[in-house]
């Protein structure tokens, strides 16, 4: 989501030249968002004002005494007095070529208008005509002289144009040859980009057995609701019109409360006395299912204590197709299975507290550039174009697992998918999410991602957030009273509204929120904090001027205490999410009793802005700046830090013996600053975030994958000079995603590298735990670290410049995300997906592959609905019942469901339905259960092996299972994993299973999951390229 920005606005700037755009690193030119000043256009043509200053003719202007009069060229016998004057001269064509653009416009205008003297409307007299002829002849001579001076330039242009034509011809010939060669080469897989299909009507919820009781309760409540109450529940009341970032209206008659929706995936945004947990990318790096769930439990507990009904997380989109994507850090990694497992465990943890979780952003929200039109001054958001197979096997996979985890809400994303806005894309919401995946909860929009009223309702959207329509805080909603009117005039069927509100109420019952204390005035429930002020007393409707206020902050401490303190789980996740990438001669772990190699006091240098606290963790709104140690990215997915333990603070008390420590908390250091040190600790980072904030020249998405703020230079300088070349340098990276480190990773002075990701509030403590070996280095990469951004392939590049009025991003190779692309093209990465060193060693052995079921090509026929969905009376109420009640005083900009008049409420034959609205849709054969057909999740294969700790200390190993399909598939794909802890010499059996879906692909022809014929190779190992064990099935 994004907050309103007063600088948003403008129009599509497709007329900007390449050299007009803001610059980025490596000399590239980039498109700038509207938050920053837009440079003036540099044009090869001058403006009219410039013509007036340099090329205007005072006789032609006559001090503005001439005006233009329309001429009927068919009925008038008067010709322009100006035209014969020109045509009587010699060299007319040369003259016309040389005159300025303004004069050409005047000549063109003269063909349609007569020049008339305001002082005398009669024709020119002979003296005036002669004078004008003389002056024009003189001007023509000067023009010819000027033209002769430009002859060399003219010939030079001709030469260059000829050369360009030859080059273009050669390129076309070569391209044609290559195209012919490619077209005659065997290409087993083709990914056609087709517009999004339609899928109507929106499937009704309440068809799965484990939701039956919740839907029965919801049906009883909804039956007693009025039309305006139903609309009130589906529409937010407006940005800053309640205490939370999102607030629905209540249904007072049936005692259904207003719901509080609050960010986000890292904890509670805009709240006091809450925890700043490690980011999703750090959590994914743990590869620890138990920690993933425990973190979710703690997040859900804090949301419950603060009175939040719906927590807007976890994030599983973006998936990380683009390694420079600005919000990748909110998710768990660049693989659908890793992302799915972490998301599902987080959801189970959050919802164990009765708080509704939100799976977001559905789907293909892979970059920040052009995700919203008003952020970039373009007509509409970009379109992410993806094939059906990649959509199912990659991007929708985590959402399917989230639905299996019983997630209550799904948030649709900002951008378009196959040129249909995600929040009204009926194929996505109706066809895939609700029908095929059996989603029983409600679909909410991202904040202002709703782009239509009727189409979004029919397309499957159930809740509009924050209620505002196309603009922030204007009090004009696409739903609210407009939805009331649309239902009354039958353009939106009342059955659709009934399903929308029933889904929301059923989710409320499903999480047991009907047992929560009611909010004021009936009780003391509801949110006990304000998103808009830290003061105890504040406005109830901050976005309005109504002046109503109350106690809004009760300062409830939700962080837990003692052994239940959430700082404990935050520290564990941050430590286990730290990845050891390099460790020469067992430089790590450090000894707390260390001394200098010469036997004296250990001399330690600490380098880099990232080591220190700088201005504090909350110095910039939504963490929108890179200063001090980096513990989170920026945007709506972050939180207010209760505290932040920086590395420099934690290191002050890390050694048991006396040491000599010197801190250089800056990125510009001199070689002399390192020459007398035994140990050099270098802290560097790379930041990014949501697109509504620009910081350090980064407009959401990173410009490249290099370290920021001179980090690469800092590492090279320190490592080359530490101890006069004899010292040991340890590099600690805090980053939102992969960083290219080719300029220093192989330097002999770099002895160890730790990737600490985004560790949250316990940053320094968790780092010290790993540095000194209190915790094993057990993190594993949740993405591939390539040697360059180009290694990830053309399909993984952020679109930084709009390539059309509606920017188009074609995910042609989306099936080959991250390590799959590296494997497909045999590219050697710097560090592969799943890689990570440990302080001990492990051995994997005795692999056993056992079939649990016989292979079969496809799933059985789709099972019938287990339960019939609710049925309601569909008669419409008296439109007058939807009017504002007599004497009602509306709050300015607050969004109500009431009508101010009855215009447009009469039923009529609405004829502007989306394409395909009247076509009957066949239920997906891949549906029938939560997450899809129940048979997809049957266990097909058992994988057993022995894991032995062959080192001299306790440690944790991540055992990863990959599957190689028969030909025409990615080389291998992750399908399962587990993490175990072993004492030295301990040996233990590990067992995992593979489901039918794990061994199937999505058939675009059959629109179903199909298990291919042939043998599967099942690989087991420590990373995507360290797979010592292999069996077949």
Curated annotation (Swiss-Prot):
GO molecular function, one term: beta-glucosidase activity
Segments for region (Disordered): 1-71
Spans within the Extracellular topological domain: 183-1033
Pathway: Glycan metabolism; cellulose degradation
Cytoplasmic-facing ranges: 1-161
Reaction(s) catalysed (UniProt annotation): Hydrolysis of terminal, non-reducing beta-D-glucosyl residues with release of beta-D-glucose
Catalytic residues of the enzyme: 446
Any single GO CC term annotated in Swiss-Prot or TrEMBL for this entry: plasma membrane
Gene3D superfamilies: Glycoside hydrolase family 3 C-terminal domain, Glycoside hydrolase, family 3, N-terminal domain, Immunoglobulins
Topological type in the membrane: Single-pass type II membrane protein
EC class of the enzyme, as a word: hydrolase
Entry keywords, A to Z: Carbohydrate metabolism, Cell membrane, Cellulose degradation, Glycoprotein, Glycosidase, Hydrolase, Membrane, Polysaccharide degradation, Signal-anchor, Transmembrane, Transmembrane helix
Membrane-spanning segments: 162-182
Compositional bias segments (type: Basic and acidic residues): 11-20, 59-71
Localization per record: Cell membrane
InterPro entries recorded: Cellulose_deg_GH3, Fn3-like, Glyco_hydro_3_C, Glyco_hydro_3_C_sf, Glyco_hydro_3_N, Glyco_hydro_3_N_sf, Glycoside_hydrolase_SF, Ig-like_fold
Function, as annotated: Beta-glucosidases are one of a number of cellulolytic enzymes involved in the degradation of cellulosic biomass. Catalyzes the last step releasing glucose from the inhibitory cellobiose.
UniProt name for this protein: Probable beta-glucosidase E
Gene: bglE
